[in-house]
């Protein structure tokens, strides 16, 4: 994917298409992502419905369904006014390789939910005892002056002088979201943010409850014991290389 960030370092403006002579794989990934989006999360479509479960008594289920229908409408009003459709397409492109990662953050009053497709070179994934992805590390290059905007609840006492004196200097920030298994019956995640260059921890938090992890990771297919998925592009890599060389 020449339009997606690579795993190796590149110079700004460096050409990435000089050795691509056949566009089949490049176009195929775009079509793959578009078809997935059209089939699973169609743009401006209502692709889920909340319904009363089997635990709800049948006599009150219609009333519950009516209320859940209103909630479903509100959910899709938020989704359709957000950047979800754009970001999920990018994540589906990564899924063609094998693994997609999306970050869901709380937004503002005018844009309540913000979605962000995270390129794979920016994250490191690990699995827990149940072989599910429950540990996500993310690396970011951020201006010092933007730290307080991105992490408003952070503690910047140790690096306050550096932020004031050199706000345009970029630093490496590591975010860690790790499942806490002290109580296996509760879904709890420990969240830590540190500035690597200054060895300073600026934020520690805890996410509690089912679905509290802001990172959504999904894999196309995987081999036993592996963390990352294997997508259609990964499996077809030999054919892609051969086709590119024979053009």
Predicted regions and their residues:
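Extended, helix-rich architectural segments
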Residues: 1-170
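General secondary-structure edge motif
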Residues: 55, 173-174, 223
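Generic recognition of flexible, low-complexity loop/linker segments
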Residues: 88-92, 158-164, 174-182, 191, ...
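Short, flexible beta-strand-to-coil junctions
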Residues: 95-96, 104-110, 176-185, 194-199
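Secreted/luminal cysteine- and crosslink-motif detector
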Residues: 136, 172, 193-195
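A broad structural signal for short, well-ordered beta-strand segments within beta-sheet-rich domains
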Residues: 171-173, 215
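Extended, charged amphipathic alpha-helical segments
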Residues: 185-247
């Amino acid at each position: 994917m020449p339009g997606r960030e690579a795993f190796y370092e590149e110079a700004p403006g460096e050409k990435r298409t000089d050795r691509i002579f056949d566009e089949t794989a490049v176009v195929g990934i775009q079509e793959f992502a578009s078809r997935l989006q059209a089939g699973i999360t169609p743009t401006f479509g209502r692709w889920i419905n909340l319904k009363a479960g089997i635990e709800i008594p049948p006599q009150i289920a219609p009333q519950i369904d009516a209320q859940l229908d209103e909630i479903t409408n509100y959910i899709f009003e938020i989704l359709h006014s957000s950047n979800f459709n754009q970001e999920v397409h990018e994540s589906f492109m990564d899924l063609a390789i094998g693994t997609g990662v999306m970050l869901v953050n709380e937004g503002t009053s005018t844009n309540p939910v913000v979605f962000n497709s995270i390129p794979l070179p920016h994250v490191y994934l690990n699995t827990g005892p149940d072989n599910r992805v429950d540990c996500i590390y993310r690396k970011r290059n951020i201006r010092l002056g933007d730290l307080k905007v991105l992490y408003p609840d952070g503690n910047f006492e140790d690096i306050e002088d550096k932020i004031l004196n050199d706000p345009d200097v970029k630093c490496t920030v590591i975010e860690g979201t790790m499942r806490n298994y002290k109580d296996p019956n509760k879904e709890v995640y420990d969240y830590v943010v540190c500035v690597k260059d200054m060895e300073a921890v600026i934020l520690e938090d805890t996410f509690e409850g089912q679905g509290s992890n802001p990172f959504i990771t999904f894999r196309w297919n995987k081999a036993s014991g592996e963390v990352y998925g294997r997508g259609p592009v990964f499996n077809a890599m030999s054919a892609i290389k051969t086709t590119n060389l024979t053009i």
